[in-house]
Amino acid sequence: MDTAERLDLVTRHTTEVVTEDELRTLFEESDPSAYIGYAPTGEMHIGHFTTMRKLADFLRAGVDVTVLIADLHAHLDDNKSPFDLLDARSAYYETAIEGMIEAAGADPEDVTFVRGTDFQLDEEYTLEMYRMAAETTISRTQRAASEVVRESESPNLGGLIYPLMQTLDVKALDADIAYGGVDQRGIYMLSREILPDHGGESPICLFAPLLSGLSGGKMSASDEASKVNLTDSPDEVDEKINQAYCPAGEVEENGVLEYLQHLVFPVLDVRGDSFVVERPEEYGGDLTYESYDEVESDFVSGELHPADLKPSAASAISDVIDPVRERLADKDELLAEAYPEKYGAE
């Protein structure tokens, strides 16, 4: 695979690359490494899957991939995960992410998993964090983390430490590429700015899109109707997609279309499959699509009606998450330990 092919593979389905010239040079000169970090807080859902799916592209392009389970970050961000649940939630995240990587057509054994507590308490890391804290203003760290950590009129100190640690993680994990959702952009721009003054190099940054919720607007972790969970049954997926905001001809904030664009079609492409919308012959018969653009074009023109799109979209989404669902099917004890209030640990 030549540089152009690797570059295309790694950058497709992203919202921004900072910068593409740096990434091209990196591929020409070395076999790069990339990392993504996830703080183990609430249950993972399909929004996470669109980001994790990209790791399969990194692997195919010959990139070494590390997944950081940022357990300390989960506690620092307004105690989203109590300290005594960090280990259980970290184990759950590892299992769920392995399933998502497998569902995307890659081998989770090819990915290195690391927890924050494996290295973030080391003396060298801690001393460098103190140096960074002494040289970075409160307003700069707040601006960097504004799209990630929970904000309030009286924020906890943990939310200020959070972006500094995330910056140091790039150096500690020896990552050439920092990958994450576009909400992470502020933190990684801080990393590019200050990391060279702390013994590291400015990371190349790739950002994934954030999906709209199924009810329109932003996807909310607290709104079950706004997202498909990785453990949802096929019937639950059908119900959520059937009730989703999907007005005829409208693309803006249409979660059903975004699921197809950023998750279903990339996975179908790897599998060599098409997306089929089943329709009665009296309404024109089945429609077969090889690309998302074809779906959007027919949807906007009115050729494809939401009533026909939704059942087929639900079936395709359910099929994509099935390997993850199966991996978690016999993990009742793990879920109960990670989320005792919901699953009732005995």
Curated annotation (Swiss-Prot):
Top EC category: ligase
Compartments in which it is found: Cytoplasm
Subunit structure, as described in the record: Homodimer.
Assigned GO CC terms: cytoplasm
Catalytic reactions on record: tRNA(Tyr) + L-tyrosine + ATP = L-tyrosyl-tRNA(Tyr) + AMP + diphosphate + H(+)
PROSITE patterns assigned: AA_TRNA_LIGASE_I
Protein name: Tyrosine--tRNA ligase
SUPFAM superfamilies: Nucleotidylyl transferase
InterPro entries: aa-tRNA-synth_I_CS, aa-tRNA-synth_Ic, Rossmann-like_a/b/a_fold, Tyr-tRNA-ligase, Tyr-tRNA-ligase_3, Tyr-tRNA-ligase_arc/euk-type, Tyr-tRNA_synthase
GO biological process: tyrosyl-tRNA aminoacylation
Record: residues binding L-tyrosine: Y35, Y162, Q166, D169, Q184
Protein's organism: Haloarcula marismortui (strain ATCC 43049 / DSM 3752 / JCM 8966 / VKM B-1809)
Superkingdom in the source lineage: Archaea
Reported function: Catalyzes the attachment of tyrosine to tRNA(Tyr) in a two-step reaction: tyrosine is first activated by ATP to form Tyr-AMP and then transferred to the acceptor end of tRNA(Tyr).
Family: Belongs to the class-I aminoacyl-tRNA synthetase family. TyrS type 3 subfamily.
Record motif 'HIGH' region, residues: 40-48
EC number: 6.1.1.1
Alphabetical keyword list: Aminoacyl-tRNA synthetase, ATP-binding, Cytoplasm, Ligase, Nucleotide-binding, Protein biosynthesis
GO molecular function annotations of the record: ATP binding; tyrosine-tRNA ligase activity
